[in-house]
Amino acid sequence: MKNKNISFMTQAAMIAAIYVVLTYVFAPFSFGEVQVRISEALTILPVFTPAAIPGLFIGCLIGNILGGAILPDIIFGSIATLIGAFFTWKLREKSPYLAPVPPIIANILIVPFVLRYGYGVALPIPFMMCTVGIGEIISCAVLGMVLYFALKNTQRHYLHSKISITDNFIVNIYFKDNFYQSPELI
């Protein structure tokens, strides 16, 4: 049980860190009324692990803070990502093509109101729903599905793998058909 908790927290932390880095690196595209937040492609990850739900939420929270977002954006933008991640996880048994839908809808319904009432953007809310929606479709549906199929193909190779570390810090990796042993580190 303890190893499962550690694994869960490690996965969540790694996902949060990747989300923050992608948001920060692509900051010019990640904020505003017309945005394509590349890190939102990670909202496909709850299909693979429930640890992605808190990971994406914390990553979005930290990414918004580091990106200089205002408090309503930090709170409600992160909640939109949390809602999207949760419902992506709930849809994990359905078609993979449905997985990007929850974060797209959550952001379309929440972010335009943050832009209007938090940032004072004078554009009509339906227009901002369209611009945010287009950005989310690019991030979640297009890039997210690319990530999904890349991970799905990789998962096949590592599904039957085992990793062990010996006393001499030699890493042994047992794949389904192959064996790899790293050189001795110490």
Regions found by a protein language model. Name each.
Residues 18-24, 56-64, 112:
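Membrane-embedded alpha-helical segments in integral membrane proteins
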